[in-house]
Design a protein with these regions (language model features):
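Residues that mark the start of a beta-strand
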Residues: 2, 83, 133-135
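C-terminal helical/coil "lid" or tail adjacent to the Rossmann-like core of SAM-dependent
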Residues: 170-171, 175-210
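N-terminal beta1-alpha1 cap of cysteine-dependent amidohydrolase-like domains
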Residues: 1-78, 197-233
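Pocket-forming structural segment of enzyme catalytic cores
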Residues: 98-183
């Protein structure tokens, strides 16, 4: 499989998924939109992954490329039916590109927190092998407030009703992070917007908490990756 990866910050890449892709002889190209990279045509790609980032989906004036990115996601998912995976901002962009709504969260989620599968999520192939409730890393202050028509909510948390979503048989997204590596928190904490959300000493506390859960995070990531590939391979 040849995957097109959209990134919005150099340090917010596919993380541990990269090692799984290399191991399994898949290939991928990345485009760094926040650095002014142009969006190439989707021809020749078998799937689209959209990663996280510090900007919000409505900040088109500050980040004009967001409009073109949303159009590309609509083309990829709704018209071409390409397999899709979106994380954090990528989750929100999928929702808005397909007609849903994203807004500021009433309560921001930052840190290691629990997510619970919905009944639909527990029955979904993408979450096969995962427990009904699991720990994950959250780092967001916006969320999907209305899913697009035809979407199904697969997971929720106390503060966020749409933690994971499926649209059609081929498109999946999650508000929470599953791509973590040992240096992820340190690297992301260098982004001013993320550092501000953490507050004084927050990066060190989050890094320690993430390290304590890293084995479980990585196991979950591999299971989700395996499931996604089985569905879309």
């Amino acid at each position: 499989m040849h995957i097109f990866v959209l990134q919005h910050a150099v340090v917010e890449h596919p993380g541990i998924f990269q090692s799984f892709l290399v191991r399994d002889n898949h290939t991928y190209d990345t485009v760094e939109l926040d650095q002014g990279a142009a969006l190439p045509a989707l021809d020749g790609y078998d799937a689209l992954w959209v990663m996280g980032g510090p900007m919000d989906v409505w900040q088109e004036a500050e980040h004009p490329w967001l409009k073109a990115e949303k159009a590309l996601i609509t083309d990829a998912v709704a018209r071409r039916k390409l397999p899709f995976l979106g994380l954090c901002l990528g989750h929100q962009l999928l929702a808005e590109a397909l007609g849903g709504q994203v807004a500021k969260s009433t309560t921001s989620e930052v840190g290691v927190m629990s997510v619970s599968l919905t009944a639909a999520g527990a029955a979904a192939d993408i979450f096969a092998g995962l427990p009904p409730r699991f720990a994950c890393l959250q780092w967001h202050s916006a969320e999907v407030t209305a899913m697009p028509a035809g979407a199904v909510c697969l997971a929720a948390s106390v503060a966020c009703d749409v933690q994971a979503m499926q649209w059609g048989p081929h498109a999946f997204s999650a508000q929470f992070h599953m791509e973590l590596e040992p240096d992820t928190v340190h690297n992301w904490a260098q982004i001013p917007e993320y550092a501000a959300a953490l507050g004084a000493g927050g990066a060190e506390r989050m890094a320690a908490d993430a390290a304590a859960h890293m084995a479980g995070f990585n196991q979950m990531a591999e299971q989700l990756y395996t499931n996604w590939m089985a569905i879309n391979g």
